[in-house]
């Protein structure tokens, strides 16, 4: 019986059977070696006198140890197993029982043999194919004199090309030829006697027979023969091929299953934007298609394929990276990046916790190694300029130098994002890093583009705030934010404005306040719980039971009231509140302090009566009051020039006629409140800026000077209060360079401070006071239009000699303040006395002045050359000083009512009202 027939028949086993056998036995033994202690693994068939062990380490290939009675043979690796073993070593000693079994089986086979040797009793489905294999093998065996297990399986391999005869995993005729040791050719002779069978064949048939009986098979199948050969470590090259192939398949499956584990460091310090896009957790990206296409084009390069997004804060640099992740998730990208994954690396998280030198470098190297092994990662670095200084210390290198080699070779695909200033400050200084990034400029969105972006985000914000946005509200958010929020950029500021308007409307329409009945029940429940605990502590369980029942009843009542209120609110919840254009205007008014909401009826009446309100504090000067009122009305109704301040006025006139007082009255009445007029007015005394070096204090000191970085006194105040009155008092005393600085403010409504920030003056009312020509006004004073025209021409000529033409040409109006008449001074005296009476009333003293005393004050305080300031000094001397002496002497106490009068000598007389003569 030629044993090659057995091998040829054994190779007939189909692939699934071999895969099952390998998985149950060899794979488990070999691949489990590196993961656990050496373990004895049972062969897939019941093998006698044979065990299989595996030993392995983390870095070396697992090894097999075959045990055959007293012989121990170590197989160091999978490759070339058959070359290190000989048949003599691999053949176990045949027991007497095995010999008898073999002789019986061989006799049966010989009795059924035909002219050409064949084994007809194979398992159905394989017998015919095995018979053909034996016939093919006979031709090969005729060249050999000894029948063993090392003859090539040529007969079987000729049948492998058909579908029903698929080869064993990885087994080809070439491999078999290479793995089989050649036997020298002998004269053509086919051994038929049993003596010519080798001991390997005898033992293999015996084991196959035993296994067939063990599993209740009536015949010996090819599966039994093959597993018998492998279990006896005969035909070891078949086991080598099967295990190598299965090991590769298993490693591939493990690699796929542990792909996420291999990105452990990257996932610890990063965020998978592609996964978030697949889950729908990213906001939709509207527009920016041109910039995204440019990024994809750079990513498709072979080397230096690293785009760097450069733009101002808030223009949408991060949104472009998220948009790319969304396109990859939906597959709407070229095939060059279809399988890529966008991961955002958090540099702050990467740097956190690096206590010792080298920890940051180790994290970065692990990240780069994971990216290199994966090969499908696009790394997004927001604020990429932090790479330049991250980790830099004495004796260490920064993160940028670690990234540079990978960026240049194309091993790392990175999308950076930074601002224009940071790019110039950090990236451009490092020429080696700059050449590895390809800049992509991200401009600020236009108003129309911003409206489209807001419409794309509308659904997300409606779901969050439970409101509805009208198209007019979105347009207003884009336009108003672009117009009134100057220190930020679109679309970020428009999105924030839309978000804030939604939150305002939601809170305004919220009906979550509990009713009074619910509050009373909750208070009673709290009291009941306390009494129950006290009863339990003193072991009064009867009382505790009663309180517990009362507690349950209270909870039921509270729940019923709450559910009823929820049901009543359900119809309102369906009809969600609507965010309108006026809601957006209210939101930006809260944000900037500029009144942009529509003019209400109350405010309309307030604007129409603005002159009357101002005249309560400012006596006379009708022209100035009217000019200021007209400017306020234009600005409030949106009719003023959008690129200039509300108004730029010069109040010219003699001292003490109410120039500064008018600005204060305007700030108190319209821009602020009467209690705090200073909060709505930016006042600068220009006498403090007489020196040339003091001019820089208006906008901030330049680098290298004291107070650099503190902000300018003018620019910083307007940045904090953009809707205010800017009063430049006694402007003619300032240095001439101050007027050059104000040219840009008067014409364009903007000014750049010492830190490079642009300050918006478009919502300010600029008032400058001057005393130029005051002596001429006093000397040429008089009544009538002729005198007023003569004074105006005189003052205008004087101002032309003092100020430059470009400064005067940018002023809206120069208003002349006339000297005060005695009648106007009397009215001012009444205002001052009423103001003093209000201060004394806070001390508990009721004050009343007579007409005689008022005339005395006007007589001593009137001076046409000095205006109303002498009047204030007269009030202080005649009234305040006299009343203070009486209070110190005890003649006037808290709660008294006093009357102030004047005697015939022109002195003030203070007496209590109950001491007055009848």
UniProtKB/Swiss-Prot annotation:
Pfam families: AAA (PF00004), AAA_2 (PF07724), AAA_lid_9 (PF17871), ClpB_D2-small (PF10431). Gene3D superfamilies: 1.10.8.60, P-loop containing nucleotide triphosphate hydrolases, UVR domain. GO terms for molecular function: ATP binding; ATP hydrolysis activity. It is found in: Plastid, Chloroplast. Residues 266-515 are annotated as: I. Keywords: ATP-binding, Chaperone, Chloroplast, Nucleotide-binding, Plastid, Repeat, Transit peptide. InterPro entries: AAA+_ATPase, ATPase_AAA_core, Clp_ATPase_C, ClpA/B, ClpA/B_CS1, ClpA/B_CS2, ClpA/ClpB_AAA_lid, ClpA_ClpB. ATP binds at residues 311-318, 653-660. Residues 579-774 are annotated as: II. Its main location: plastid. SMART domains: AAA (SM00382), ClpB_D2-small (SM01086). GO terms for cellular component: chloroplast. It comes from the Eukaryota. Belongs to the ClpA/ClpB family. ClpC subfamily. Molecular chaperone that may interact with a ClpP-like protease involved in degradation of denatured proteins in the chloroplast. This is Chaperone protein ClpC4, chloroplastic.
